[in-house]
Amino acid sequence: MSNSLPVPVSLNEYLAHLPMSDEQRAELAGCKTFAELHERLSAQPVNDPAEAAQASVGRRLTLTTADQLEDAEMLGVDASGRLCLKATPPIRRTKVVPEPWRTNILVRGWRRLTGKTNPPKPEHDDLPRDLPKARWRTVGSIRRYILLILMLGQTIVAGWYMKGILPYQGWSLVSLDEITRQTFVQTALQVMPYALQTSILLLFGILFCWVSAGFWTALMGFLELLTGRDKYRISGASAGNEPIEKGARTALVMPICNEDVPRVFAGLRATFESVAATGDLDRFDFFVLSDTNETDIAVAEQQAWLDVCRETKGFGKIFYRRRRRRVKRKSGNLDDFCRRWGGEYRYMVVLDADSVMSGECLTSLVRLMEATPDAGIIQTAPRASGMDTLYARMQQFATRVYGPLFTAGLHFWQLGESHYWGHNAIIRMKPFIEHCALAPLPGKGAFAGAILSHDFVEAALMRRAGWGVWIAYDLPGSYEELPPNLLDELKRDRRWCHGNLMNFRLFLVKGMHPVHRAVFLTGVMSYLSAPLWFFFLVLSTALLAVNTLMEPTYFLEPRQLYPLWPQWHPEKAVALFSTTIVLLFLPKLLSVILIWAKGAKGFGGKFKVTVSMLLEMLFSVLLAPVRMLFHTRFVLAAFLGWAATWNSPQRDDDSTPWIEAVKRHGPQTLLGACWALLVFWLNPSFLWWLAPIVVSLMLSIPVSVISSRTNLGVKARDEKFFLIPEEFEPPQELISTDQYTYENRWHALKQGFIRAVVDPRQNALACALATSRHRQAQPIEVVRMERVDQALKVGPAKLGNQERLMLLSDPVALGRLHERVWSEGHEEWLAAWRASIEADPHAPLLPLQPVGKASEPVPV
């Protein structure tokens, strides 16, 4: 092709960023235009100069990874002949049909009365009713009846004690006839103390029953772990060394959305290498399913995927896909995977963005599934590790020390009708596709639409279809990370709170197993207990005010002979308070006793683990009222329809600034101070009972800030406080994750979108991975031209994120933008690109040197 335009002055700069030899660079430096340069690189004639950059994508891409891309047959062409990178396997669609929810029992009853039938369910090859009846189901039912008796019996006794503690004992003497003859004010003053006491007693019963459930769960978990005699544990179903059948293919899927890219792909690489070390890598494929809508992060993900595939030789085993339409959030992401590739796999392991799993753990999960044909989901108990802030280290210590008791206890009571936590679990693909697709909740408002907390619902649907849901609580090799500070944890809790409240709409859905109805209830109580506790404290304060400010009514009947005196039984109050403290803190003591018995070396020794437990208990006492108020706010926000978003500034060291702590905790501090002054004015002696609450609220700002500091967490680890075995003797997977995270951060891609537009190599990768591959059509061409013109007109600083996403998804528009930025010399884009390189202290030296086949001569 011919062109009389002068030689661009930036041609040499462009060539310097392509990895090739000096001879190749000198040969291409003679090109008159960028269109000619791209034509030479592509080794084929280009009729339209605007498409020249698109034509050279393949050559620019293979300059760095030619051998591996060709060996894995990763390069292909789309329907229009444009080069694309096969980042996903060929699509083989499977039907995924969610069943509509019928949450209104009145509507269901009316349909039954009127003879209307529901649409027939889809027919499947293997119906769940054909699964054999297992003995564990009968055993589980008996155990849960025992748990119910223990909880209710304990609550009734405690409620009886609580009733005796309250001062006003005369409900039976309140005469309804007398009330009708009094004024409203007289009636209110007479009835108010008893109404307050009744409300307090009701709330106390609910809260005590909730505490009792946790106590009995932890106690049975302690006995299970201490004796080691659990013939129903799922991990005993396999010997652990059976060869995995060739057809038992497993997909490891990692849904991500705007995550920390270096950490995500470090954990993925560590998991991949651990699976490879088992010799069973051919049974596994890895999928990164991205819902990222921040273009800089999306480009960084693409580069990180290419890097991890190149470094592990994982092309054809590690796949990457970014959705353009983010439907139904995480559950929709998994639905899309099941619809496109789910039929190719027998099992699926779901990973979180911070998950790491060992190869031994993953192969054991597959063997357990093979050995347990009626198991639909097997959930591991992830161990928290890898954090440095004081807050996170205390939390991961708590989950590592106390968590095993509760997970073992859950397994004891639930057996194969247990929890699924949404990650670090293996799922039988066929029943999951057939029965666990989630339809939106009907109606309008905050509790309608796409289900947020999908995991509990999927477990309930799996059990409804007749498949078991198990917790492999004793299976090692499963890891996760915790939020680094209190405010980040609360952001997560707000989403979980809304999701659990939504799930409760499914409590009465037809066919749900009673255990999973209870799971929905416990999910709600995890957050609803906070406002109940808050209202309990408020009503107690109101009762104190009534008792202090109002003259007691001693005679409730017209001809009552003896006065009714308010009663005080401090000995009963102390006994009940002591019992509650035992229920709350005995599980923690039992956890440490278990560690003493099993070996405390990995926790820093008996003395250090005991001191750490005491410090963690003090810290949990300080944080409990803070969480109570936040969770109360979250519950109210969900019912009032407030948006569940909380934008918090990014912090490299994960610490909480003082200004943010004041903003978030200031109202709590003020409430605590006012509450303390009110109680002191009413009755100073009562302040001792309320001191743990109000003092914690007044200290919330410094506690939140100080606990978020990394230096304090590292110092505590150096002194062997809050130490966990994964730090004392870290497994190879966690060592590799830390190493790869450090390496990834060293050369992490910054200003990704600008790089994808301007940089020769990044543009080639972005064009090859772009998924919006439309055929030639005039309306599409007009839109493309408008997008490119707009990007050049406003520059990178003013281009909106939505416009960036559209360009990043369209290989043609992105290629044209790249070509015009260089050929027309758009300095605003070029300067931003140069600045991003100069700001990177780890940028490679220029000109880039050739890699592999990049040293071959450039076709003329």
From Swiss-Prot:
Enzyme class, UniProt record, top EC level: transferase
Keywords: Cell inner membrane, Cell membrane, Glycosyltransferase, Membrane, Transferase, Transmembrane, Transmembrane helix
Transmembrane segments: 146-166, 200-220, 519-539, 576-596, 610-630, 686-706
CDD domains per record: Glucan_BSP_MdoH
Subcellular localization(s) per the UniProt record: Cell inner membrane
Keyword Membrane: yes
A Gene Ontology molecular function term of the record: hexosyltransferase activity
Pathway connected to this protein: Glycan metabolism; osmoregulated periplasmic glucan (OPG) biosynthesis
Coiled-coil positions: none
GO biological-process terms attached to the record: glucan biosynthetic process
SUPFAM superfamilies per record: Nucleotide-diphospho-sugar transferases
Predominant subcellular localization, coarse grouping: membrane
The family this protein is said to belong to: Belongs to the glycosyltransferase 2 family. OpgH subfamily.
PANTHER family, alphabetized: CELLULOSE SYNTHASE CATALYTIC SUBUNIT A [UDP-FORMING], GLUCANS BIOSYNTHESIS GLUCOSYLTRANSFERASE H
The protein's role, per its UniProt record: Involved in the biosynthesis of osmoregulated periplasmic glucans (OPGs).
The protein, known as: Glucans biosynthesis glucosyltransferase H
Lineage of source species: Bacteria, Pseudomonadati, Pseudomonadota, Gammaproteobacteria, Pseudomonadales
